[in-house]
Regions:
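Conserved N-terminal glycine/acidic-rich loop preference
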Residues: 9-16, 49, 71, 93
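Enriched for short, Lys/Arg-rich terminal
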Residues: 74-97
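Arg/Lys-rich, positively charged N-terminal/basic patches that mediate binding to nucleic acids
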Residues: 1-34
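Basic/aromatic recognition patch in beta-strand/loop cores that engages polyanionic ligands
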Residues: 49-78
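Short proline/glycine- and basic residue-enriched helix-capping loop/turn segments at helix->loop/beta transitions
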Residues: 45-46
Length: 97
């Protein structure tokens, strides 16, 4: 059973992050950062309450900082989360969610 799912937008975010990271710091750093994000998704799925509630943005959403990014997610069931977006911390979240 999957513990987390990525929205279409989150998948696009992840591809953009991977492309930027590789072009700036190389494949090894890209692989490391994507692995760290994947580990963060798993941690959030296992402990969905660890993120900061952000109902002021969207009802039921939580956010969790990871390095230069903020992971936005919500619980789907008692056993899974949906990663909604992975946005750079400098972005305007309201316009992206």
């Amino acid at each position: 059973m999957e513990l987390f799912q990525l929205s279409k937008e989150a998948k696009s975010d992840l591809r953009s992050i991977a492309f930027f990271t590789e072009s700036r710091w190389g494949k090894a750093q890209r692989n490391l950062y994507i692995k760290q994000l994947d580990d963060a998704f798993l941690t959030l799925a296992q402990n969905p309450g660890v993120g900061i509630p952000c109902d002021y943005i969207r009802a039921g959403y939580r956010k969790f900082p990871h390095a230069s990014h903020i992971i936005f997610y919500k619980s789907c069931t008692s056993a899974t989360i949906l990663v909604v977006r992975i946005l750079h911390k400098s972005m305007d979240y309201d316009s992206q969610l």
